[in-house]
């Protein structure tokens, strides 16, 4: 089906299996489903599809201007389209679906992209915009997948599974989520990053911002060489922060100042490194065989502090354990200037 001008299609359903629809502008309005399996929908200008379901597996949907795909609470399937062209808009791209399946799929826009889906499955898929990317989803699966924005990225919703996946923003990244599973995954921005999540698991993963990074979570797990890093200031707030076994490549690292607030901090064999001042406020702290280093002043307010075989170092250090015990057996407190320790009891054997 081909039209030199604009083409408007209204029907109960449309079967374009292995077919081709070409027009100068395309609007498809259906009561039911559109089957574009191995088919092609091509528009030189705008393209819009509305219906109850859209299946474009192994297919191509392409527009020279803005594109809107709306299946309401239905399924939009774009699987296995990495080598087929997938869904591509030279303008903005707006998608609404109950379930968006982009497994091993390809979905891109040259301008702003907005996705609203109850469930978004981008496993081993590519989904991106050369401008901003805004995603609202109850469940987002991005294992070994890639979500990329040329400018800002905004994620909101429920659970994000990004194991071995990539979330990348060319400028700022903002996420408001329930759970972020980023084991062996990468979450990176060239600007500022702000993440507000209930639970964050970054074991072996990378949370990196070229500018400031703020992460607020009930539980933060950054074990097994997990890396949380900022090019400017870094702010972490959690009820429980685990930063164990950082190894040579992991830890919590900032080029600028660092602020840590935690109910419980376990940094056994972990690394906390600030390029400037470091302010730490916590309940119980375990820094056994760990390293806490500030290139500026280090202010420490906690309850019991276990620094056995650990290192706490700063340009100047002030430690207050609120009358609790400081266990520094085999540990080191190293201040280039003034060192102040206020504690209930201190064990400094071999320290």
Predicted features along the sequence, with ranges:
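A composition-driven surface/loop motif
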Residues: 1-351
């Amino acid at each position: 089906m081909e039209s030199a001008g604009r083409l408007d299609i209204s029907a109960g359903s449309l079967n374009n299996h292995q077919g081709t629809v070409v027009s100068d502008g395309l609007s498809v309005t259906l009561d039911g489903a559109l089957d574009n399996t191995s088919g092609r929908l091509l528009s030189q200008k705008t393209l819009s599809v509305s219906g109850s379901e859209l299946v474009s597996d192994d297919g191509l949907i392409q527009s020279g201007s803005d594109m809107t795909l709306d299946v309401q609470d239905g399924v939009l399937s774009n699987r296995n389209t990495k080598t087929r062209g997938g869904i591509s808009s030279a303008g903005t791209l707006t998608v609404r679906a109950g379930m968006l399946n982009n497994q091993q799929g390809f979905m891109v826009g040259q301008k702003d992209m907005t996705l609203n889906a109850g469930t978004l499955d981008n496993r081993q898929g590519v989904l991106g915009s050369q401008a901003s990317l805004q995603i609202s989803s109850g469940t987002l699966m991005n294992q070994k997948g890639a979500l990329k924005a040329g400018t800002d990225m905004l994620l909101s919703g429920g659970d994000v599974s990004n194991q071995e996946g990539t979330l990348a923003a060319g400028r700022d990244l903002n996420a408001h989520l329930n759970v972020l599973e980023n084991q062996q995954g990468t979450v990176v921005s060239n600007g500022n990053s702000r993440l507000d999540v209930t639970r964050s698991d970054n074991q072996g993963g990378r949370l990196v911002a070229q500018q400031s990074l703020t992460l607020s979570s009930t539980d933060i797990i950054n074990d097994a060489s997990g890396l949380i890093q900022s090019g400017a200031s870094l702010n972490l707030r959690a009820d429980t922060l685990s930063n164990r076994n950082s190894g040579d490549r992991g830890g919590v690292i900032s080029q600028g100042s660092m602020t840590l607030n935690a109910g419980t901090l376990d940094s056994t064999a972990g690394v906390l490194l600030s390029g400037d001042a470091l302010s730490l406020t916590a309940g119980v702290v375990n820094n056994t065989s760990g390293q806490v280093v500030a290139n500026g002043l280090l202010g420490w307010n906690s309850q019991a502090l276990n620094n056995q075989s650990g290192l706490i170092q700063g340009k100047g250090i002030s430690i207050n354990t609120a009358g609790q015990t400081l266990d520094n057996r085999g540990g080191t407190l190293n201040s280039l200037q003034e060192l102040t320790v206020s504690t209930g009891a201190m064990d400094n054997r071999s320290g």
